[in-house]
Regions:
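Short, aromatic/His-centered strand-loop micro-motif at the edge of beta-sheets
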Residues: 44-72, 92-93
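Ligand-recognition surfaces built from glycine- and aromatic
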Residues: 14-17, 95-124
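Secretory/extracellular carbohydrate-interaction modules
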Residues: 1-47
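Short beta-strand/loop motifs in extracellular/secreted proteins, especially
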Residues: 5, 78-80, 116
Length: 124
C-alpha cells in the first residue's frame, strides 16, 4: 500500500535511522503490514477491522486525501506496546526486545505520503 505511514522501532548510537550501529526491531505500516526483524526481538501484531471499515479502496483513497491519526506507545521494561486505529483498521503490536538494549527510538515515516503537524503528548 502506497501513501501509508509506518513506524520503526530501532536503536543506533546517534539516535538516527541508519546511524552507526543501527538495529531495526520493527517496521509496521498503519494498514498492519509489517516486516520481520532479524534482531533479537519478538513482534506480535494484531490487525482487526471495526464497523467503520468500508474496504481497502476507500481506506487508501481517504489516506491519500489526508487523515488525522493517533498512535499510542507505552514501554514496560523490554516490551513496547503500540496501538493505532484509523478508518476502521485497528493495529496493536507488542515488541519484546531480547538483546538487553535499553535506549530505543521510534521513527514515523512513510512511502509517498506527507506527515505533518505531529504532536507528542505524555500520558501518566
Amino acid at each position: 500500500v502506497w501513501h501509508c505511514p509506518y513506524f520503526c522501532i530501532f536503536s543506533s548510537k546517534n539516535g538516527q535511522v541508519g546511524g552507526d550501529k543501527y538495529r531495526e526491531y520493527l517496521l509496521l505500516k498503519m494498514d498492519g503490514e509489517n516486516w520481520e526483524s532479524e534482531e533479537k526481538v519478538v513482534n506480535e501484531v494484531l490487525i482487526d477491522h471495526t464497523g467503520d471499515f468500508s474496504g481497502w479502496e476507500n481506506w487508501m483513497d481517504k489516506n491519500k486525501q489526508g487523515i488525522d491519526c493517533k498512535l499510542r506507545i507505552r514501554r514496560e521494561g523490554k516490551m513496547i506496546f503500540m496501538k493505532t486505529e484509523n478508518l476502521g483498521v485497528s493495529v496493536n503490536s507488542i515488541s519484546t526486545v531480547k538483546d538487553g538494549t535499553k535506549k530505543l527510538y521510534i521513527a514515523l515515516t512513510g512511502d509517498q505520503c506527507a506527515i505533518s503537524n505531529t504532536r507528542i503528548f505524555r500520558e501518566n
